[in-house]
C-alpha cells in the first residue's frame, strides 16, 4: 500500500509541474509574438540608418571631423570591445550556451594574439558564466529588465560612444542570438564599429563576420571631394544620392548616435525574441515529457493495484479451500 501511495504522490507532483511548464510555454509564446511585432516595426528604420551609414564610407575621411572619423577607422593597439547578450533567467535550453562558447573561443584567439579585451555583458547568465575566468576583462555588467527598456540601450550606447571618443577601443563587436523561428536561433557575431559596408539578411547564412581583431584587413576609403555619398534606396533597386554637406555640421554625428542606438536595439529585440522562442520550445518539451512520465506512472500504479488485488484474491481462495 505504501508503494501505491508513493506512486499517487509522484503522479500528483508531476501533474503540478506539467501545469507550470504549460503556463510558462503560453507566456513565452505571447511574449515572443509581441517582440516579433516590434522587430517587424523597427526593421525598416534600422535598415535605413544602416544603409545611410554605409553610404558615408564613400566619403573622403578628411571631409569628416576628427570626432566623426573615430567611428569609421580602426585605432591600432587598443582593446577589442565585446558586447555579450544573454538571458537574465534560465529554462531556455541551449540559448546561452552557444553565445558563451563563441565568446570564449574568440577571447582565447585574441589572447593568443596578445590583444587587449573589454567585455560588456548584458544578462545574468552570461555574467555568471564569464566572471570567474574573465573578471579582469569585464568593463560593465547590465541586468536585463523584464520588458524592453530604452534606458538599457542608452547606457550601453553611452559606454560605446565614450570608449570610441576616448580612443580606448579598436573595434566593437556584439554577440546575440538572431531569431529565425521558435525552434531555431542563430548565434550571430556582428560588427558595430568601425562602421562596415551594409549587409542585408543574406548574411544570416554565414553570421560570424570576420573582423579586425579576428584577422580582417582595415577597409580602404574611396576619396571624393565633398560630403556626398551614394547608396541603394531601402527596398528599391535604384540608388539615392545623400548630400551631407548642406544638412548641418552635426548631421553625421547625430546619424552615428542613431546608428549605434539602432544596432543595440536590433540585437536586444532579436535576443529577446530568441530567448522567448527557446524557452517556449523548452517548456513544450518539458510538458510533453511530463505527460509521457504521467502515462508511465499511471500504468505502473494500475499494475501495482492489480497485483495487490490478485494477491488478495489468491489469499481468500486459499483460505476458503483450507476451511
UniProtKB/Swiss-Prot annotation:
Pfam name, any one: ATP-synt
What does the record say about its membrane topology?
A: Peripheral membrane protein
Keyword flag Cell membrane: yes
What is a GO molecular function of this protein?
Answer: ATP binding
Tree of life domain: Bacteria
Places the protein is found: Cell inner membrane
GO CC entries: plasma membrane; proton-transporting ATP synthase complex
Keywords, sorted A to Z: ATP synthesis, Cell inner membrane, Cell membrane, CF(1), Hydrogen ion transport, Ion transport, Membrane, Transport
Which CDD domains does the entry mention?
Answer: F1-ATPase_gamma (cd12151)
- What does the record list as GO biological process? proton motive force-driven plasma membrane ATP synthesis
The record's note on quaternary structure and interaction partners says: F-type ATPases have 2 components, CF(1) - the catalytic core - and CF(0) - the membrane proton channel. CF(1) has five subunits: alpha(3), beta(3), gamma(1), delta(1), epsilon(1). CF(0) has three main subunits: a, b and c.
Main function: Produces ATP from ADP in the presence of a proton gradient across the membrane. The gamma chain is believed to be important in regulating ATPase activity and the flow of protons through the CF(0) complex.
- Which NCBIfam families does this one have? ATPsyn_F1gamma, RPE2
Assigned protein family: Belongs to the ATPase gamma chain family.
* UniProt-recorded name of the protein: ATP synthase gamma chain
Q: What is the name of the gene encoding this protein?
A: atpG
